[in-house]
Curated annotation (Swiss-Prot):
Pfam families attached to this UniProt entry: PRA1
Identification of the protein by name: PRA1 family protein H
GO cellular component: endoplasmic reticulum; endoplasmic reticulum membrane
Main location: endoplasmic reticulum
Encoding gene, per UniProt annotation: PRA1H
Membrane topology: Multi-pass membrane protein
GO biological process, one term: vesicle-mediated transport
Annotated TM spans: 142-162, 189-205, 209-228
Domain of life of the native organism: Eukaryota
Compartments reported by the entry: Endoplasmic reticulum membrane
Family: Belongs to the PRA1 family.
Described function: May be involved in both secretory and endocytic intracellular trafficking in the endosomal/prevacuolar compartments.
Provenance organism: Arabidopsis thaliana (Mouse-ear cress)
Keywords: Endoplasmic reticulum, Membrane, Transmembrane, Transmembrane helix, Transport
Keyword Chaperone: no
Length: 241
């Protein structure tokens, strides 16, 4: 039976290898592989441009350096702008909030080596989806902190929020005392009046502005952190005996 020369040197195609990495949960290897490939391509391009610059005129050297700088800057701007087109919650599920909160210093923040610029929009999308699943509870905590800070900066909004809570507690007390459950029409009318009063109170005291500012800041922090945060091993792979 005839075999091709050196059959053991057959390699797995890159798409199949990357698909296996995704299915196995080793996305940090794929992230590292993408960053390494981008760094190798950038270094080879810089070496070739420097070699060409030694044999070119000074004007050509300046133009080539300027063109390379603007091309790199444009590529980075395209990558950053692609973060705005990503739906970060497409792969998020309720189970991601049921686990333990990732440690803030070692897991969520990390060190300086834990961050790098994404080499492409595909890598940025992969990082955002995976990091949001891993740090879902951390991002939720950040939103609560930002919302509390916004309420602290806007005392009227805090008064409006507390007033709306007090209004619904009063409605619950009156409902239990006067037995609104026995009168469905009266209960619906009371709920409608309470909803209108709550909406007017929250709008008049600018609670929606505090909520919007907290959402905007927390969303920006989440997207930037998830896009620039390298994928770290969530669990160690098991080795066969």
């Amino acid at each position: 039976m005839a075999f091709s020369p050196n059959p053991l040197s057959l390699s797995v195609p890159d798409p199949a290898f990357e698909s296996w990495l995704r299915d196995s949960g080793y996305l940090e290897l794929l992230d590292h592989r993408t960053s390494a490939a981008a760094a190798a391509a950038s270094s080879s391009a810089s070496v070739s441009s420097s070699a060409a610059a030694t044999s070119a005129a000074s004007d050509d050297v300046v133009s080539s350096i300027t063109g390379g700088f603007f091309a790199s800057l444009l590529s980075r701007l395209v990558t950053v702008s692609s973060l705005l087109t990503i739906n970060p919650f497409s792969k998020l599920s309720a189970d991601d909030f049921s686990g333990d909160t990732t440690p803030w210093t070692t897991g969520f923040i990390g060190n300086c080596d834990s961050y790098s610029f994404p080499s492409s929009s595909q890598q940025a999308r992969m990082r955002v989806h995976e990091n949001i699943k891993r740090f879902a509870r951390n991002y939720a905590t950040l939103f609560i902190v930002f919302f509390a800070c916004a309420l602290y900066q806007m005392p009227l909004a805090l008064v409006g929020l507390l007033g709306s809570l007090a209004l619904w507690e009063l409605f619950k007390y009156c409902s239990d005392k006067w037995k609104f459950d026995r009168h469905p029409s009266m209960r619906k009318l009371s709920i409608g009046i309470g909803q209108c009063a709550t909406a007017v109170l929250l709008t008049f005291l600018n609670v929606q502005m505090a909520l919007f500012s907290a959402l905007a800041i927390s969303y920006s922090v989440m997207i930037l952190h998830a896009g620039f945060r390298k994928l770290t091993p969530s669990k160690k792979p098991t080795r066969g005996r």
